[in-house]
């Protein structure tokens, strides 16, 4: 039988979860905590097989509790909250939570998520999974935009690859040498380079420049 630790600052929620979980003979309640600080202590003392964790609580939040518990234990933790804010979902999953459930979820979904967590899997509700995928896509898109060189920066990079110095590049482009150096700094930052040679090498590896350029 799997030992469950319930963490929530509302007594009525803890009592309701206890009554629900006791209907499943695969689980037994071994403890309950009213905040993250108590949860961290009980995780050490009781060594539960799974933890149901609220997020917003006094003294210590659920996210901080997850972080501290995960530093010492591999106990699967399922977030059970009323909040579906993007940053909470992301941070919770990144900290190692095996699930993110809203408190209006069905008992069937709760038990399925707990069963999956016990097996070491992450099971997310379709709407939450979809939102996390959208967030990941937005992150990747933003990252691509942040690292993508502008047309003017590519022109400078091509000139550098030909061995031209900043002064010569500035003359050819009809801009100031200061502008060229500014674009070069931007190129370094976007490519993670520390020198002209490294910038050209990375650009060729990424396909931004080719030998024909």
Swiss-Prot record:
Pfam families xrefs: GerE (PF00196), Response_reg (PF00072)
Subcellular location, record wording: Cytoplasm
Upper lineage: Bacteria, Bacillati, Bacillota, Bacilli, Bacillales
Protein name: Transcriptional regulatory protein YdfI
DNA-binding region location: 166-185
Keyword Transcription appears in the UniProt entry: yes
Any one GO molecular-function label of the UniProt entry: DNA binding
GO cellular component: cytoplasm
Signal peptide range: none
PROSITE patterns cross-referenced by the UniProt entry: HTH_LUXR_1, HTH_LUXR_2, RESPONSE_REGULATORY
Biological processes annotated in GO: phosphorelay signal transduction system; regulation of DNA-templated transcription
InterPro entries: CheY-like_superfamily, Sig_transdc_resp-reg_C-effctor, Sig_transdc_resp-reg_receiver, Tscrpt_reg_LuxR_C, WalR-like
Role, per record: Member of the two-component regulatory system YdfH/YdfI. Regulates the transcription of ydfJ by binding to its promoter region.
SMART domains per the UniProt record, alphabetical: HTH_LUXR, REC
Main localization, broad class: cytoplasm
Domain HTH luxR-type: 142-207
Post-translational modification (record): Phosphorylated by YdfH.
UniProt modified residues of type 4-aspartylphosphate: 54
Keyword entries, A-Z: Cytoplasm, DNA-binding, Phosphoprotein, Transcription, Transcription regulation, Two-component regulatory system
Ranges of residues in domain Response regulatory: 3-118
């Amino acid at each position: 039988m799997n030992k469950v630790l319930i963490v929530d600052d509302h007594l009525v929620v803890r009592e309701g979860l206890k009554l629900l979980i006791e209907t499943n003979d695969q689980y037994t309640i071994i403890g309950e905590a009213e905040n993250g600080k108590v949860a961290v202590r009980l995780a050490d003392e009781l060594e539960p097989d799974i933890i149901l964790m609220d997020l917003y609580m006094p003294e210590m939040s659920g996210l901080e509790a997850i972080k501290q518990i995960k530093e010492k234990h591999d106990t699967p933790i399922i977030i059970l909250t009323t909040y579906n804010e993007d940053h909470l979902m992301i941070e919770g999953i990144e900290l190692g939570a095996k699930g993110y459930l809203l408190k209006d979820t069905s008992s069937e979904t709760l038990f399925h998520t707990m069963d999956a967590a016990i097996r070491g899997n992450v099971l997310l509700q379709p709407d939450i999974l979809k939102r996390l995928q959208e967030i990941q896509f937005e992150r990747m898109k933003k990252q691509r935009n942040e690292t993508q060189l502008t047309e003017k920066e590519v022109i400078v990079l091509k000139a550098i690859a030909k061995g031209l110095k900043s002064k010569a590049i500035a003359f050819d482009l009809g801009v100031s040498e200061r502008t060229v150096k500014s674009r070069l700094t931007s190129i370094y930052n976007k490519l993670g380079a520390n020198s002209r040679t490294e910038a050209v090498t990375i650009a060729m590896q990424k396909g931004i420049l080719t030998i024909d350029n």
